[in-house]
């Protein structure tokens, strides 16, 4: 019994990585020794399997729901422990000013592994130059280190591009997966392969042109009773609308035609996004329920958040899962409120925001993640337009790199 329990805990919380059947060209590893991404996924999870909804960047995420199950800073502690295995110098651009933020990013663990803070790009290069000699243009062409900088922040992006030119062999965290974060279309394309399709809900990408036949076509092709309408690039649950097939036509008309006059007050916040959404298309997914989660004597349709790192080393993609937890909506399944209030989990006006995933489900989740994520990471590397991996090609035996195309209508 004890041996079995130890095996389960090792599988759930072990730092060991998962290898995919994916091989890079021999010359890739000599030029690009290490890629490292810190990510989250939101997913629906039930007895039938796992449906991945979207990717997010771990360095940009709040982990209150996960840390509450352990301790403040636990999630970042796991990331630094993972990054330390490579034996490279670790850098974090701009030291947090307040104590709460320092605790959140597990500063003690970072410093324990000889991590160092730098205020900006010039401070970082100055610190590196203490032990390494730059070449004539001020760059360090052979320097290998792990650098975490939030390049999605407008203030930090110039620092990132400058450092990329001066440290061509450095590993910038989230450089690969960041191209797919909060991009629902690109995420969906990743899964259009045999062996990966089962990890995504059925969906359609539609042009923002309302016509009476649109709802009928969506219902006819997807054959669902309930749908989730989403903007392609909105973040943090903005603009998401849950709707039954009976209300699909009227809802499409509201968001595509009557943008300024929300018809249903309970959806007004979601509808507001559509009045200024810049995309010419949107995505419609089948609604997939999670296994009901009991909290405080009530059942909830929660969304599963998984936190993990992916890295490429020696021509192989690896995945390290840090944990998973349920994100709760504001209302229980049987409450007499709107569909959004019952099913949308990006809500912060509840005293209880999260719930743990039971051990048996965690083991089953790990098996599914071991199958899906390394293959997805290999595809990310292939399809990213990042200059670090231009020309690289990850081969996935048994699958093509160009899968079936979901119809746009």
Give the role of each language-model region:
Residues 60-64, 156-159, 237-239, 251, ...:
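Short helix/loop capping segments that flank catalytic or ligand/cofactor-binding pockets
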Residues 70, 98-223, 235:
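Conserved N-proximal alpha/beta basic substrate-recognition cap immediately N-terminal to
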Residues 23-30, 56-91, 108, 339-409:
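C-terminal active-site "lid" helix and adjoining low-complexity regulatory extension at the edge
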Residues 51-56, 228-229:
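Short hydrophobic beta-strand that contains or immediately precedes a catalytic carboxylate
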Residues 40-47, 56-59, 96-97, 134-136, ...:
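Short, flexible loop/turn elements at secondary-structure junctions
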Residues 187, 201-205, 226-266:
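Glycine-rich phosphate-binding loop of ATP-grasp-fold ATP-dependent ligases
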Residues 32-39, 44-50, 244-348:
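Phosphate-binding site of ATP-dependent enzymes
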Residues 1-20:
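Classical Sec-dependent N-terminal signal peptides that target proteins to the secretory pathway
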């Amino acid at each position: 019994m004890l041996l079995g329990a130890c095996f389960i805990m090792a599988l759930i919380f072990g730092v060991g990585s998962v290898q995919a059947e994916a091989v890079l060209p021999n010359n890739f590893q000599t030029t690009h020794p290490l890629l490292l991404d810190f990510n989250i996924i939101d997913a629906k999870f039930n007895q039938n399997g796992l449906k991945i909804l979207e990717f997010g960047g771990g360095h940009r995420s709040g982990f209150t729901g996960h840390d509450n199950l352990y301790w403040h800073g636990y999630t970042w502690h796991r990331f630094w422990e993972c990054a330390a295995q490579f034996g490279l110098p670790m850098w974090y651009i701009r030291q947090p000013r307040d104590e709460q933020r320092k605790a959140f990013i597990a500063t003690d663990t970072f410093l324990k592994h000889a991590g160092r803070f730098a205020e900006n790009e010039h401070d970082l290069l100055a610190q590196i130059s203490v032990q390494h000699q730059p070449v004539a243009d001020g760059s360090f062409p052979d320097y290998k280190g792990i650098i975490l900088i939030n390049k999605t922040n407008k203030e930090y992006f110039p620092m990132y591009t400058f450092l990329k030119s001066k440290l061509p062999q450095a590993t910038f965290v989230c450089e690969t997966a960041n191209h797919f974060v909060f991009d629902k279309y690109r995420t969906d394309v990743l899964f259009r392969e045999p062996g990966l399709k089962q990890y995504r809900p059925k969906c359609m990408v539609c042009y923002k042109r309302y016509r009476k036949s649109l709802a009928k076509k969506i219902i006819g092709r997807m054959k669902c009773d309930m749908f989730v309408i989403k903007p392609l690039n909105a973040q943090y649950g903005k603009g998401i609308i849950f709707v039954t097939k009976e209300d699909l036509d009227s809802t499409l008309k509201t968001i595509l035609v009557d943008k300024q006059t929300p018809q249903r007050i309970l959806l007004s916040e979601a509808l507001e996004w559509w009045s200024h959404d810049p995309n010419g298309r949107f995505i419609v997914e089948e609604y997939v329920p999670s296994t009901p989660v009991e909290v405080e004597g009530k059942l909830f349709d929660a969304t599963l958040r998984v936190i993990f790192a992916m890295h490429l080393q020696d021509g192989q993609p690896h995945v390290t899962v840090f944990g998973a937890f349920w994100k709760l909506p504001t209302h229980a399944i049987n409450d007499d409120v709107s569909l959004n209030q019952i099913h949308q989990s990006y809500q912060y006006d509840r005293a209880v925001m999260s719930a743990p995933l039971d051990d048996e489900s965690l083991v089953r989740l790990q098996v599914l993640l071991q199958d899906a994520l390394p293959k997805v990471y290999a595809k990310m590397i292939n399809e990213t337009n990042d200059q670090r991996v231009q020309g690289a090609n990850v081969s996935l035996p048994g699958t093509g790199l160009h899968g079936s195309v979901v119809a746009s209508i």
